[in-house]
Amino acid sequence: MVDYYEVLGVQRYASPEDIKRAYRKVALKWHPDKNPENKEEAERKFKEVAEAYEVLSNVEKRDIYDKYGKEGLDGRGASHLDDEREYRFTFRKADDVFKEIFGERDPFSFHLFEDSLEGLLNSSRSPSGSRGRGAGSHVSRAYDHPALSGLSSYDTGYSSYVSLGHEGLTSFSSLALDDSGMGNYIPITPSGKVINGRNINTKKAFENRQEREAEDDSELISFLVNSVANEEHFTDKCNWRRQSFNNYSPNSYSSSNTTQYTLVDNNEQGTSWVTNKKEPSIFSAGFKEGGRRKKKKHKEGQKKKKSNKRNH
């Protein structure tokens, strides 16, 4: 007998919001279009997920299910109903339920989460309500946000990272937001490959009519602007590059279930790259390019110091 609570992975006391969030996650996981090699099982699971949501999201139907199980919904348990009248529930098509929740938008596109991005950005604000500025800004763990909760265990239709012997290659897509919040999008295409046991990560972005590409393997290897090596940008990026990982205790977690995040500040692009070791890319909030002026002042200060030393 199918347990609808188990199908959605929720407790019996789950709230309507929990039910809807769980449906989004599991429905994306078992959507037949995402499982072409296992379509028969995916269709069965997808149908079960839709049925579970239809029952548990409705107060009356959920109450009948809790008391009499699925038989009560099918009418087979009618003799056990309080009012002794027959109650038969007809399930809708799984695709119709899916469209009701996700709308007509592409379910495997990051645009699916646009409506929840404002909440994601708000979650990274300070307690006083103002957003942090500059390199010290707080970047939230996006996968903890309800709208993106499904991304932690599987992607949204893009290929998962797989190492193919000594060389493996895959590509992912993500969005960067500038400091205005929702207004301007910068397309980012990170990719990764393994060469001789070393992880080589490449990130490309097109902004202000310039294509910028950075390649690194924990140490920056190259920085290109419009496919041409740029020594100044390379030096700046090396100087301003830093990594920030979430708290991790080896005594309480294993490396297999702990996600480590890397924050790389790139003020030349006005963008902070946020990556983690389990998933190559997630949403990242951009910074204003005020850091560029700071670096310019810093360089001028260094030149003055050198000039003073020569004079002495």
Curated annotation (Swiss-Prot):
Keywords associated with the record? Chaperone
Which GO annotations describe the biological process of this protein? chaperone-mediated protein folding
Q: Identify the residues that the record assigns to the J domain, covering every copy.
A: 3-69
MF term (GO), any: Hsp70 protein binding
Question: What ranges does the record list as Basic residues composition bias?
Answer: 291-312
- InterPro entries linked to this entry: DnaJ_domain, DnaJ_domain_CS, DNJB2/6-like, J_dom_sf
Task: Please provide an example of a Pfam family that matches this protein in its UniProt record.
Answer: DnaJ
Annotated spans, Disordered: 272-312
Summary of the function given for this chain in its UniProt record:
Probably acts as a co-chaperone.
Name-wise, this protein is DnaJ homolog subfamily B member 7
Species the sequence originates in: Mus musculus (Mouse)
Q: Which gene encodes it?
A: Dnajb7
